[in-house]
């Protein structure tokens, strides 16, 4: 009882005098809910941990939680209407004893239950996280290690990948130099007879990789890795390099070269010789010849070449122009540097095709021809010379027959060079020799398994053969390697249109990031739109915006619409304008090839100086897209 003159407020008074939250507290509803949730949590963890032991399906735990969630409101209602009394469970309305001591004792018991259930749940959680998960991870790692070991057992012993040499110079901008040395080492090692050498594009995927040597070796399909670092300071260079076994990371050979910078070419040659000796492989000659080095031995020219090559690969108009300027500086230092004349020719072609139109494009092509002629005069027997000549003939002169002859010569001179293989496969593809092209692309992938453009080219060859499922698989593999690589979603649009899948065509067209191919892909997707007004509008809009510069792609849209008269009219325009796309797609394009039995197709091939394709479509395919 309170003191005289004061009012005692009791929270245990009659129910009608309490608010809803006080009533929930009085009836221990909060505590009952906490016990229920804790028990469900603990039991669900227990079921999840024991289910694999009894080979129970995965849905057991999920449905247990769902059932408990459904039962939760009933439990709350039960705890509201019933209470525990000295005589047992009773309806709240039937209990008139108001034994406050027992009521408080019940609350304390529920508190202990809550603590116990939560503690048990936490123990299960810790067990699952730190014990079972660790064991599962160990088991998974053991499985992965077994799989990797099995894959490495299949690769040839005489195989190597050159990982990008780490740049340890104070200036991070010197990375182009360490990358250049890595790339030149790859080029040098391709001259070793009987040695499988992984191309730069795939090897460089593992820059700063945390993967183990075994994982890298399995991914690239090689038994050995070359890794190391480059430190340049002033006029001195230190190159530390080692050859290791992929299977266990043990060293086969290692050495550190600390030399004047002017001796960098000799260092590269020594490394190649040492690797060949360590693997017991004979060289094609007495020593490795570094054919892409400046004939004058000018180190400044070499460094500028590496810098320019790295910048051009950024692929923007500004970077290509900057690279061209650097190449021109190189040629002022060493006018007889044939390799750089070739780089200048290629960069000029790319500048004209990708970024210029009209007279500016033609001037870029003229510059490319002049540079290619210089290269041909200085290094007529270099593989890269014939690759560059073929590229010029294919892209600028629309001469795929002449280009293929050059690519074959380059491949004969450098049979292990992945770039030469890739260009030869492309040359075969451009002339409709798709089976041979597909076979060579697969061989190229074996030497450069992570190079995305090879997969993209392979997909186009498969499209020409109407192998739609395989073309889609290869394209999606390329997307895994480089999701933003140009043209991949356009490939998927073509596949969808050939299948008549309008929804997939529309979805993939919106994902194509290349501005030229993206506009074409969106227009192509509309051509199978049931709304013909939209299809017509898309075609008119594309012709208005792109028809002048992309006549071949306009012809392609008409082919997809099954309008051969307009298709041949635009194909003639493409040939007359020497549209670079004409020679690269005419004999592989599934939409155009649907009309290869039309006499106008044979006449066009004769006019362009290319043979009829050596593959034939099925009757269904030949009837049109």
Where on the chain are the PLM-derived regions?
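Long, low-complexity intrinsically disordered segments that are proline/alanine-rich
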Residues: 2, 6, 141-147, 622-623
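An N-terminal, helix-rich hydrophobic module
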Residues: 2-135, 250
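Alpha-helix N-cap/N′ positions at the starts of helices
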Residues: 15, 299-307, 367, 518, ...
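Acidic-histidine catalytic/liganding microenvironments
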Residues: 27, 192, 334, 589-592, ...
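Acidic, proline/glycine-rich low-complexity intrinsically disordered segments
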Residues: 50-53, 106, 111-492, 496, ...
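Phosphate/oxyanion-binding loops and surfaces in catalytic or ligand/nucleic-acid-binding neighborhoods
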Residues: 70-73, 80-87, 192, 246, ...
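Alpha-helical protein-protein interaction modules
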Residues: 387, 402-408, 418-424, 428-625
